[in-house]
Amino acid sequence: MVMSQGTYTFLTCFAGFWLIWGLIVLLCCFCSFLRRRLKRRQEERLREQNLRALELEPLELEGSLAGSPPGLAPPQPPPHRSRLEAPAHAHSHPHVHVHPLLHHGPAQPHAHAHPHPHHHALPHPPPTHLSVPPRPWSYPRQAESDMSKPPCYEEAVLMAEPPPPYSEVLTDTRGLYRKIVTPFLSRRDSAEKQEQPPPSYKPLFLDRGYTSALHLPSAPRPAPPCPALCLQADRGRRVFPSWTDSELSSREPLEHGAWRLPVSIPLFGRTTAV
């Protein structure tokens, strides 16, 4: 069977295309293999350097605790010790300076003529730039979290007295979580709160009718002007008292007036909680 010129050309182009494509794929695979090998070598070098640094850190720490660290100048002696040594040397070798007019005896040799063999000058303090850098474990502890901010989820989980869940705050119908004096209660406050009997949440003056709480004026009085009315409302307490524990314990008898109601109306609201 004899192939025509067109068929031969087509097969040649087809085979050449796939050969070139295969060479390109092989070249890409070889390049990726080289890159991975170089990256592995770099990781091994970094791992060796980290291991050496970890091995040298205990030696440097021991040197700083025992004496001078390797490669650095000896540590500076404490100042109070040098101050104590100076008076001792002064007492052992007093420098007597007698005025020539008051001196009557024979001339005494100078005190510096025969210095003590063990008396040496104090070593100079090393420069500050050669001091040992602080270690990560020697850094001061971070300041405590700000108590005025709500805790994050991790802190709330680890707390001994975690805040109430968000579902409980949403389903609260008495407004207990609307007024928070402090963000976190201490153990003492919680113990005192447990010792106190729970307040009875019942409306006030329900045993009597509403007519007994309403005092109608015997004679009609003119209505106060608007500014006086606003000032009176501002000076007074809240129109609707809340159902918080702190206010129930110190609740006073309900004041009767035009702006007071005989029954406390709870206010619903949402607060941020975990």
From Swiss-Prot:
Region spans: Required for apoptosis induction: 151-274
Bias kind Pro residues: ranges: 123-137
Stretches for region Disordered: 63-148
Biased composition (Basic residues): 90-102, 111-122
Keyword Transmembrane: yes
Post-translational modifications: Palmitoylated.
Tissue: Strongly expressed in brain tissue including the hippocampus, and moderately expressed in esophagus, trachea, lung, ovary, cervix, prostate, testes, thyroid, thymus, lymph nodes and peripheral blood lymphocytes.
Annotated localization: Cell membrane; Postsynaptic cell membrane; Postsynaptic density membrane; Cytoplasm, Perinuclear region
Single Gene Ontology BP annotation: T cell differentiation in thymus
Residues in compartment: Extracellular: 1-9
GO annotations of cellular component type: cytosol; dendrite; glutamatergic synapse; nucleoplasm; nucleus; perinuclear region of cytoplasm; plasma membrane; postsynaptic density membrane
GO molecular function: long-chain fatty acid binding; protein tyrosine kinase binding; protein-containing complex binding; ubiquitin-like protein ligase binding
Motif PDZ-binding location, chain numbering: 272-274
Impact after mutating Y177F: Reduced induction of apoptosis
Gene induction: Up-regulated in peripheral blood leukocytes in response to T-cell receptor stimulation.
Sequence positions bearing Phosphoserine: S64
Subunit annotation: Forms a complex with NMDA receptor zeta subunit GRIN1 and epsilon subunit GRIN2B. Interacts with GRIN1 and GRIN2B. The interaction with GRIN1 is reduced upon NMDA receptor activity. Found in a postsynaptic membrane complex with DLG4 and GRIN1. Interacts with DLG4 (via PDZ3 domain and to lesser degree via PDZ2 domain). Found in a complex with JUN and FBXW7. Interacts with JUN and FBXW7; the interaction inhibits ubiquitination-mediated JUN degradation promoting its phosphorylation and transcriptional activity. Interacts with SRC.
Protein name per the record: Proline-rich protein 7
Species whose genome carries this gene: Homo sapiens (Human)
Species lineage: Eukaryota, Metazoa, Chordata, Craniata, Vertebrata
